[in-house]
């Protein structure tokens, strides 16, 4: 995570002046404050950033629950049920990347701040309320939340559009509309001052003519969380959601007496749905060149789930005169609600598998970076442009940031005998099983094997590689080895995966770290390059 943005901000003290600098198409000033805090106080360890991720999602779930319970007029037991469902969806494994990757704090943040903005902007719904002073109402909280969302992620700009549309329909006073429009204009001017489009991405207006592919992208974007394994079904569900939003918006537009959308909660939920739909549109226009498959990325599950939570709440709570139409709306809402819940619960069963895959991917990337070996195929899983990571590794190592704050990072390049005590070989078991040269690094190679700490009857968590008396690389255990488990019952994940950097003609040996990583125990097998 740190490497993803640290390329341009290698000195915290000099970075404040660049807080609003462009990052791709975004200006992520608020997320950078979180990153700087993590970097300065927690040495880039992720703890603070991931804590913020959890808190943002929890607060968002609580606010959505409040809106839904208000719209449905829920009692105490019903509130608990609604809250449980919303929390389960907001922390669903469908959006796993957003919940475990620190950089995604901006992705979760913009939708939470957007909900807060719309909640306060639309809180004044009657003519008498709108006559109140602009400076003494929740309006200001909503307006400045729009500013915060804008400088969290680019789609925050859409809140000004949504806010203006709903403000006009909500009969804001001329004074309030003027203040909001002025602030919106100022923010847009500041945002696009010295703005540069990424040459690798199409301009949104250049892809408008691709109407059907854009619609398909939007449909997959919205429908994928309900049908993650069947794209055609996801398209149908996404189209259903888009049509529902269109019909609800038309009903809201012509509902002059507020008979259908008769509460602040209903209007806010509709505004949230429109905001997410516009986000899907802008995303489709900017990403359609990558193909419709790109809309299935797990990061998009967060706005899609918010979309369905709000849509289902609307379908289950709005009131119309025709009993037949009302029954149809309720049935559609119930079916979609059950489908979303079923999909989320089904996907939760995959959490152990997903967690293990993420863990191994990160450990492999950490081993590559700690060993100073460039394995492009592994680093692509944690960063879209692996060379950028290698360009900041020396800086991260020098300042002991992120993974270089780990104790094992200090061992690389050090003498084995001076850094660790050597224990008898009967205190461990293991072997180097496979060594693979890397096309992306001439002097680096990948090693696989297994290791067991016999003093504790458990896998040895960390392994080091030694040549010519110096520690040249590291590996981490966690790979399931059923063949080893046959000989050591109960020890499942003794397999390790790591890297070493050595010159041709030297021999490499592997040592398991035991005794709280204070001692090294030689494993069987050696490799001569």
Regions found by a protein language model. Give the residues of each.
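Intrinsically disordered, polar/acidic, low-complexity terminal segments
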Residues: 1-25, 39-85, 136, 165-167, ...
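Transmembrane alpha-helix segments characteristic
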Residues: 81-89, 181-189, 260-287
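Membrane-interface alpha helices of multi-pass inner-membrane proteins
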Residues: 133-152, 159-167
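Perimembrane helix-loop-helix junctions
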Residues: 158-189
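Juxtamembrane "helix-exit" motif on the non-cytosolic side of transmembrane helices
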Residues: 38, 69, 91-101, 191-199, ...
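Basic, ligand-binding patches in group-transfer machinery
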Residues: 410-529
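Aromatic- and kink-enriched transmembrane "portal" helix at the membrane-lumen/periplasm boundary
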Residues: 80-113
């Amino acid at each position: 995570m740190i490497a993803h943005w640290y390329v341009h901000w290698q000195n915290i003290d000099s970075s404040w002046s660049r807080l609003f600098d462009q990052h791709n198409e975004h200006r992520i000033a608020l997320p950078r404050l979180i990153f700087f805090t993590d970097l300065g106080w927690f040495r880039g360890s992720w703890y603070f950033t991931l804590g913020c991720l959890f808190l943002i999602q929890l607060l968002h779930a609580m606010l959505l629950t409040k809106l839904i319970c208000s719209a449905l007029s829920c009692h105490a037991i019903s509130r608990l049920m609604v809250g449980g469902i919303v929390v389960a969806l907001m922390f669903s494994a469908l959006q796993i990347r957003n919940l475990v990757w620190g950089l995604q704090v901006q992705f979760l943040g913009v939708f939470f701040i957007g909900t807060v903005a719309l909640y306060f902007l639309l809180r004044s719904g009657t003519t008498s309320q709108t006559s109140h002073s602009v400076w003494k109402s929740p309006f200001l909280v909503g307006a400045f939340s729009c500013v915060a969302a804008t400088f969290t992620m680019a789609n925050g700009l859409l809140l000004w559009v949504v806010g203006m549309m709903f403000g006009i329909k909500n009969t804001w006073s001329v004074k309030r509309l003027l203040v909001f429009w002025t602030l919106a204009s100022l923010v847009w001017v500041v945002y696009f001052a010295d703005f540069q489009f990424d040459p690798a991405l199409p301009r949104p207006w250049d892809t408008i003519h691709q109407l059907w592919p854009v619609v398909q992208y939007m449909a997959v974007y919205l429908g994928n969380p309900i049908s993650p394994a069947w794209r055609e079904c996801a398209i149908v569900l996404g189209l259903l959601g888009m049509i529902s939003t269109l019909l609800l918006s038309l009903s809201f537009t012509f509902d002059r007496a507020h008979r259908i959308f008769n509460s602040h909660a209903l209007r806010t939920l509709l505004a949230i749905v429109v905001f997410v739909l516009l986000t899907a549109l802008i995303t489709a226009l900017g990403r359609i060149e990558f193909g419709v498959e790109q809309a299935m990325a797990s990061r998009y599950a967060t706005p899609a789930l918010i979309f369905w939570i709000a849509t289902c709440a609307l379908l289950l709570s709005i009131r119309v005169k025709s009993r037949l139409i009302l029954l149809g709306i309720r049935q559609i809402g119930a079916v979609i609600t059950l489908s979303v819940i079923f999909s989320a619960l089904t996907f939760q069963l995959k959490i152990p598998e997903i967690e293990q895959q993420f863990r191994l991917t990160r450990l492999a990337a950490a081993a590559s970076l700690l060993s100073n070996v460039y394995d492009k195929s592994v680093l692509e899983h944690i960063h879209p442009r692996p060379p950028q990571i290698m360009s900041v590794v020396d800086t991260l190592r020098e300042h002991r940031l992120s993974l270089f704050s780990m104790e094992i990072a200090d061992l690389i390049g050090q003498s084995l005998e001076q850094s660790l005590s050597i224990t008898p070989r009967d205190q461990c078991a293991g072997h180097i099983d496979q060594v693979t040269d890397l096309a992306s690094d001439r002097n680096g190679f990948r090693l696989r094997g297994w290791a067991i700490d016999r003093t504790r009857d458990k896998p040895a968590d960390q392994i080091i590689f030694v040549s010519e008396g110096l520690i040249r690389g590291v590996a981490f255990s966690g790979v399931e080895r059923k063949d080893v488990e046959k000989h050591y019952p109960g020890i499942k994940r003794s397999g390790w995966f790591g890297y070493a950097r050595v010159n041709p003609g030297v021999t490499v040996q592997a040592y398991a770290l035991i005794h709280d990583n204070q001692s090294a125990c030689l494993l069987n097998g050696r490799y001569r390059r």
